[in-house]
């Protein structure tokens, strides 16, 4: 059983192992075959494979690339200096690609600087931007990109991926436990995999195998979101919904607001 992070160890390296988004994979395949890519804006919920897809692109075309996490480097100088240095330097390849992850964390001024850099270096440098909230990205950037919504694979596909990982790690498991973990973490695939790895207990002295032992209380604690969405879907009484929220120790209400915002289309249909 590996002690490295499973989310990194089993991150897909090419389109053949990337789960879901078949319609988007066809478009990316065309880019890979042409050895070129336009500016891309990949948006969607956290943990659904946006960054993975961006890395598949740069790892499968002939390019030099740089990765920037905008949640850590989101100020004007951070963006301008790092990108300008990379884009203007002499490279080994004719094409350069910059992955700007979580770009919805960029300040408005930083986004304005990014727009100018995209124009200045457009001949030989492409940008792949990822974000959870596309409405936070200024229009001039959106208009310069091919925008694609990355949707989560089905729960069945996520469960099968989890089964494959556990088998590869020589870990025993119950299918009901996998279903519980998937339901609690979906649609965030990263959260599902991390949750499973945390709850695997080594069963051999040599550390080469393990057993998935679910902490029911931990999973249920994280499952209040699913309960809340179900109650909203079923038209439960407002006091019951308030009680559910009160019964769960929620330290970050912004996460709850994001959940409701993300699911408004799903649970608002026909209302």
Could you tell me what each predicted segment is?
Residues 1-151, 156-157, 163, 167, ...:
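P-loop/Walker A NTP-binding region and its immediately flanking N-terminal helices
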Residues 156, 163-271:
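AAA+ P-loop NTPase domains with strong preference for DNA replication initiators
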